[in-house]
Amino acid sequence: MLTRFQLKDVAGLFSEGVEPEPQLAPAARRRRRLETLRESVPAGVRRFAMVAFNLLGRRELATLPATLDLMIRDRFIRSNVLPDPRAALAGEEGLAGLAPDLSPATMMEAYGVGLNPSASLGPVAWHSPPIRRVSTPGKLAQSPALRVEGPAKTFRATFDRDADSILAASANRGDCASLTPERLINAFAELFDAGYAHSFEVRDAGGRLVGGGYGVAVGRVFVLERIFSRRPGAAQVGLQRLAQCLRDWDFALVECGAGAFDLCGEAFDDVSRDFYLASLGEHLRGDRIGRWPSEGAKRNPPGARQPRAA
């Protein structure tokens, strides 16, 4: 069962050696978050245009009737029961059903059965693609696709220091892979407050944010949701450091979500949905809830390890 934490309790989640951020008053933090994560009118128009392009694109046109039928039925039925990930529609998106509830508890339950939230087809919905991209942390850390060269060698990666800025930057990349409406961004922000979602920030030698990303820890599986890069090599620096720390913290698997595939997909292997769901089921126990050490201290698993109910 997911344990919900209030903002005032977050400091108590920190692992030993984690430097707490300067604490804002709850009202001030809410205002800052609303300003940071608000979707602008131009961004909303651009997102809807991309959705239309995605729906009418050649790859998805064959499944459009079934997609619209499922969306219409779900809109009227409004069931809070999660769909079966194995019964998702055919097609690359793997649409399984709409997502009327994005509470932390429901989000974590969905991730635990292999459903990922996405708005690539318009409304926020649960998806279970037939092909999943995965890697072990150790293999990912050594991937040639993440080799860092040139100025990027001076970049520095940290964890959980500026999640709101990372969420906003990842949602405003301006491409089909980053279709993230305000409702879904705020749901990820709540998961961060609850200690399940994590961000990584990549900065240059001058302290400027040049890249980063975020994902969700589900037991010993990390689902990489989004990644962005403002400078060559920034995404590789962040993902390589993430993989190194996940390896040291005994994570078993990393999944690359659709919102991260275009920047780092070469570092992952394609597997079937059934293979991924079976692997996920083997590694659900042992949630580590809480903020990660900002520097990713080795051999120091973050947060309190809590077993999941069978």
Features from the language model and the residues they span:
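N-acyltransferase acceptor-side catalytic subdomain
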Residues: 1-310
